[in-house]
Amino acid sequence: ELLSDQNNQVGCKIVDGGMMQYAHDFSVSTFAKEHKLCSHQINGSKETIKRGEIQDKDYIGMSKDSSISYDLGIIKPQEKKILEICILIDENRNLSDMEDEIDRVTKIDLDKEYTSTKSYWRKYVKAHNSLGLKEAKNSYEERILEIYKRSILLFPLLANQETGGIIASPEIDENFTKCGRYAYCWPRDAVFITKAMDILNMEKETEKFYKVFCKKTQSKNGMWEQRFYTDGKLAPCWGYQIDETASVVYGVYEHYKYTKSEKFLKDNLKMCEKAIDFLKKYLKDWLNIEGTEERDKDKVQEEIENSVNRQGHKYHISYDLWEMNEGIHLYSLASIYSAFDSILNIYKALGKNVSEFENNRLKEEKIQKNKRTIE
């Protein structure tokens, strides 16, 4: 059953050895290798399939609810029979191309593909075993090693290979009714995932997140919205979180600490400076903090309380880390502090030995002004 049926826009067609279910922009073909169909039912099979009695005269119809069956004959005691079922998920192309693709898949040696796939992922785990964990000597170590390997295998499932966008958690329910709805990219969440990626020597994946996804999703004013689809499009949001913006700057410097790549810092410097400019304006708007004026603890607390109650702010008040309450929160302020600290460290790491800065008075003056404001 296809769950994404809307207004009877899902159809089914019987093909050689199976069936093809399709909508306007996708198709799911289910078919067997070396076995012909015994029976099928395109319409109303939800109840009949429970009795194992499916039959239909139609070869095509509008239905999200279809079924097929195969006859394996009599299976004797201790006897094994193999039924290889292929599931082909693809875009909905023209019919002849789809049928050609089904023919191609039926000719694939599945045992060979299984062995090749297993070998690939074993090499992948070995390449990213940066902690150098050895084979387990007891059940406790065995459990740790299992979680460790599964963690390595998980990260490729989280990341969009084209944009570098990283979802917070995998989802299996396309209707988002029986899950946490975490198959989106929160910049903050992704930043902490890239820290784990760095530990596991996934440098390319981390750099793609910053150099492609973050640049693609940064707003003109320098901020990042709450969450996105991994292709970079804005996802439904319910407010603003200032730590989304601050975390990206922090993450850029954290990645540099692993790689020591000045090129990576230079490639992302402009993006970080735009974010820092936004954070400074945000603080000025909500806390009325300018320059290096000293304030004692009570004065800061008083200013925060007064600021929250004032009307006419340019920027929307931020949600907390868990999106429960709007206001000025310790974690949010800490993330901004970390962003300011990170940009100062980025400037320090780049120094004056970067060709773009040499003899560039305007650039150097901007950097010095930025540093003074932050400090």
Question: What are the residue ranges of the model-derived segments?
Answer:
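Acidic/polar, glycine-enriched structural segments that form the non-catalytic walls/loops
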Residues: 2-181, 262-263
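Well-ordered alpha-helical scaffold segments within catalytic/enzyme domains
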Residues: 87, 128-142, 153-157, 191-203, ...
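Catalytic cores of carbohydrate-active enzymes
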Residues: 182, 221-228, 288-375
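Solvent-exposed loop and edge beta-strand segments that line ligand/cofactor-binding
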Residues: 120-127, 134-140, 172-190, 197-198, ...
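N-terminal start-of-domain structural block
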Residues: 161-162, 168-186, 212-218, 222-223, ...
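Aromatic-rich carbohydrate-recognition surfaces in CAZymes
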Residues: 182-290, 297, 303-304, 333-337
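Extended, well-ordered alpha-helical scaffold segments
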Residues: 98-120, 143-150, 201-216, 262-282, ...
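Extended hydrophobic/Leu-rich segments
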Residues: 2, 12-14, 20-26, 31-32, ...
